[in-house]
Structures are given as C-alpha cells and as structure tokens.
Amino acid sequence: MDEEDAGDFNERCAQCSEVNWGLTDGGRFYCRTCHNVIERTREVVSTDVIPNARVQTISKGSRSQKKTDEGWEWYVCEGFQLVLKQQAEALEALGVCPQMKDEVLCNFWRRYLQKSQQAYCNRPAGETIKALSVCDSSTDMDSEPEQHSLLHFLSVSESDGDLQTDCSYASSAGKVSESTSVCSGSVDGSLYVRKNRKEKLRMSMPMTLSFCYMALLWLKEPMTLSDLLRFVVEGHIPYFNAYQHFPEKMKLYGLDLRIFCVESWPVYEEVYNKMVELAAFLDLPRFPDITDNCFLHPDVLCMKYLMEANLPDELHNWTCRLVKKTSIGEVDFLTLTPGNKSTRKVKYDVLAAAVIVVVLKLLFLLDDHYEWLLSDFSAEGNKNNKEGEGGPYFEFKKWYRVIKCTLDVEQKKLDEEKAKYLWKCEKPLFYSVKKKSKILRRRQMVENLQIQFGKLSGSVQPAGRPNPSSFLLSWSEESTDGSCFHGHSLKGILQEKHGLLTAINTDYWLCTDKLCNEKLCGHLAHYREEDFPKSYHFVLRLFSFLLRIQPSSIHEEVCVIEHKLFNKKLYKKPKRKRSLRK
C-alpha cells in the first residue's frame, strides 16, 4: 500500500510510542518501527456506484490486550473451536480422512454458530460489536464463504445473515461490559454459564465429541462411537485438560474452568444423544447410506467383535442370517435421517454386539444349564475326532474359562487406571507473569517429591499410553496353549436337517415379553443382573467391556432384536371361532 494512505493516521503506537504507520495488503495499519499490527477502521469514500456512499471495513489486526497481564480478550466459542481443531487433528493422525477437519467438521461448526446466533447472523440495530478474530490455524476458518461447501445446504448465503469473511465472533448478547467477565478469563464466561444453563444444546466438552462422531459418521469412517470414546480415555484425542493447549495469552480462570475443565469420563449415551439432537438442530439432510460393504454395517462389525471375543469364525454365518431375517441390515434402517422421529436411531457397535448375543442364545440357550451339556457333548466329540478334521469342536466351557481369566485381568487393570487417574492439568495455570516463575517452581518441587516417594515406596511408574488399536483383545491362532477359538467348528452343536445344518437346541427364552414405552420409561427394557442367568450376564459383561458401555445398553438392544425375530409369534392374533348357523 502507498505511504500516503497511512499518512492521515497520527496516533502514537501503543508499544513504542512512535508515529510511523504503514498499511499491509490486507488494509491493516502496522508500525514500521516495532511491526505492531493494530485494529483500525478506515472510511473510504466511493463514487463509483452511489455518490458519497461510505464503505466501512474492519481489519483483523492484533487482539486488544489489556494493560495488565491478563491476556487476550476471547470468547467461549473460540475456546471450543480450538478444542475441536485439536480433536480433528488428532483423528487425522489416527488415519481419519484428511477432509474431515476442513470440509466437514469446520462446516458443521459454522452451521452451529449460525443456528445458535453466535456468528454468521443478523445483529440487532445499534448493537455494539467487538470483533474478535479467530486464532490462526490450518482449518481455513478465515477463508471466503464461497470456499467452504459440504453440500449446498451448508453454504451460507448472504440472505442467511451477515457473513463475516474474517470469521470474527461477537457476543449475541450485545455489548459485554467489563463487569461481565470479572469471574472468568473469557469475555462472556459468566454470561455464557448464566444464559445457557437452561438451554438444551449449549456447547460443552461432551458435545465436542458429538461433533467429532457426527463428522466421522458423515464420512462413514471405520470408527465407532465406542472406539472414539476409548481413544479419548487412552489420551489419543484431546479432551481432558484440552485447555492446556490454548495459547498462553488466552487466560482461563473462574467460570472458564467450569466450562472447559472435565473431571468425569465421557458417557456413551450422552455423547450419542447429543449427536442426534445436534444433527436435527443443524437441519442436516439424510446422512450417506450405510451399505453392506460399509464398516458400520452389522455384518462387518459382527466379524470384528467375533474376532475380539475369541469366538469361532463360523458364527459369522449365523449373525448374517439373523441380520437378514430381522431386516436390520437394510440401508433405510441403518442410515441416519436427522429429525425423523418415526425411525429409531441406530447405535452400530451396540447393535452388532446384540446380534452376537442373540445368536449365542439361539445356539447355546445360555440358561446356566444347557450350554454346559453342549460343551460336554463337544468335548466327547473332540476325543473321538483325534485327527481334527474341520477343526476341533467348540467347547463353551473351555471358552468361558479362557475369556473369564483374561477379562478379569483386563477389567482390574482398567479399574486401577481409572482410580489412579489424576484430574490435573500437566501445564500449570497462572494468570500473572509475576506469579509464573513461583508456580512453576512449586510444580517442579511437587513432581520431584512424588518421584522420590515413589522410589522409596517401590511403586511402579505408570507406563506410557498404549498405542492406538481397533482391538482391545487379540488372539493368535498360532498359540500352542489352545486359547484361540477362531478356527473351531460348530459341528458339535449342529445337526443336519433337510440338507441344512440347524442347531440342536430348539428352545429359546425371551429377555422380556413386552417392550416398554421409551418415552415414558426412558428405556425399551430394564436389566437387573439377578433376574437373568449368569452365562447371559457373562456374555453381556464381555461386550460391555469391549464397548466400554453398561450391560443394560446391550440388553436393551437384545430385547429389540428378539422382538423383531419372534414378532409373528409374539403378536399372533388368536383366531376367532366361527359360530355354526342353525
């Protein structure tokens, strides 16, 4: 830019007190002496279209920083945007599609800001606006509105609101007084907590995971919600103390910690329900179809969970038959359609686990009696089948012992890790430069004392976080101890009938005769461990450990599948007796 354009601006620089201004290509005033870039509104008189019409532009500039060392002025939604950015980058590092952050999650977030009246919206006349630029990142948040397009519905037109090309945020409550942010480091922290206390879809840390899962589901990524939450707990995805990665000038204290500090494990049901509500709130269209070659299809997920549960590969044929029989593999059933209240939303991982449980009930009954008889029968068959043609017969009793031993060890390890988890931030929080060195010295002293006491007590130092894996349990067919059951045969519990292999077991017990009203009870079925056989509870416990959810969630899905499978028998209308005419 020409020096003459900046010549009319004679204010002294706040940093060096010099009057030596220039203009960048973006129209921002900067000090040539100390290179400080400031916010500046300049009026340009244009006579090309309308005579004497004035056009105002607000340059991005540097954030206003208080004379004290309190840091930048920032809004709560900026903090959540940074968290989402960190989570998206972590997911990309785990192998998720690179388009997730820029082309999907970014647009979901923009849509949410517009729908919640936090940005990209018309502002009331006379409202004082403090434009705050978004932190520079590789998310292309500062790109022109024409460049972000997930679908046509996500492109925000000019009629939809005043779209700020610099993605500046402004509080929807208007001018935020200095007294508003006394109890928080952010500008609108106290206002956010007070205003959003009764709002159903207010932004929260669990909702960041709902955003991530919604983006994963849109892209049909091979990652279930249970996988996502497990990666969060293992530390591969920022969630606990995510605010420690905020820029140093974004000070957090008071109510900010109440918003961004997490001291509880993410709950599957909460994250999933918020995702469904969020998709409807954003008016998203029908998600991409879940077809039979998609990872989230029950046929594919059943194969994964059969391997992880150390069950025979032949069970996959039975799970596929059950999926086809109950029509739960249909595209319309599996695909999420936001806002459609007539269709039940699918939890893909829970559905696949429930399918396996129903198949085990069909074959082994799981009544604490019949499965052991079948196991003894298979053991006799293995003695007679010494050559091992077609693989050894599957013995439920042997499988139970192997899995129970492994499950008890892994469950104990998980419980200990959760009990020892320190809900503290690795990066100490300080709100004054004067106190920074004092706090750092105190933290270093505490850590040194912990190391010394640990050595004296002989406690084992916690191992680093495990490498990310889609499998919690792995079983090798090359093991010589016979602990892998993948190649075992089901012939010991099957019989040939009319040229087809059918189960020897012809009985079945239902978990419930009638499903509850979900709107009234909150659940379709209820589960109490003492009301069901121990074998059934053991299988539920196994899959609840693999998915990190409550056994009641899988039990509820089992009840739904059973009612689909035995629908005709359960709701068969009695025939009316014909009265004989005289």
Swiss-Prot record:
Keywords assigned: DNA-binding, Metal-binding, Nucleus, Transcription, Transcription regulation, Zinc, Zinc-finger
Subcellular location: Nucleus, Nucleolus
Region (C-terminal cyclin fold): 256-366
Region (B-linker): 69-73
Any single GO BP term: RNA polymerase I preinitiation complex assembly
Any one GO molecular-function label of the UniProt entry: RNA polymerase I core promoter sequence-specific DNA binding
Residues passing through the membrane, by range: none
Coiled coil feature spans: none
The keyword Cell inner membrane is annotated on this UniProt entry: no
Zinc finger motifs (RRN7-type), residue ranges: 4-39
Region of interest (B-reader), ranges: 40-68
GO cellular component terms, semicolon-separated: RNA polymerase I core factor complex; RNA polymerase transcription factor SL1 complex
Binding residue positions for Zn(2+): C13, C16, C31, C34
Region (N-terminal cyclin fold) residue spans: 74-255
InterPro entries documented for this protein: Rrn7_cyclin_C, Rrn7_cyclin_N, TAF1B/Rrn7, TF_Rrn7_Zf
Family per similarity comment: Belongs to the RRN7/TAF1B family.
Functional description taken from the UniProt entry: Component of RNA polymerase I core factor complex that acts as a GTF2B/TFIIB-like factor and plays a key role in multiple steps during transcription initiation such as pre-initiation complex (PIC) assembly and postpolymerase recruitment events in polymerase I (Pol I) transcription. Binds rDNA promoters and plays a role in Pol I recruitment.
Entry comment, domain topic: Although it shares weak sequence similarity with GTF2B/TFIIB, displays a similar subdomain organization as GTF2B/TFIIB, with a N-terminal zinc finger, a connecting region (composed of B-reader and B-linker regions), followed by 2 cyclin folds. The RRN7-type zinc finger plays an essential postrecruitment role in Pol I transcription at a step preceding synthesis of the first 40 nucleotides.
Official protein name in the record: TATA box-binding protein-associated factor RNA polymerase I subunit B
Organism in which the protein naturally occurs: Gallus gallus
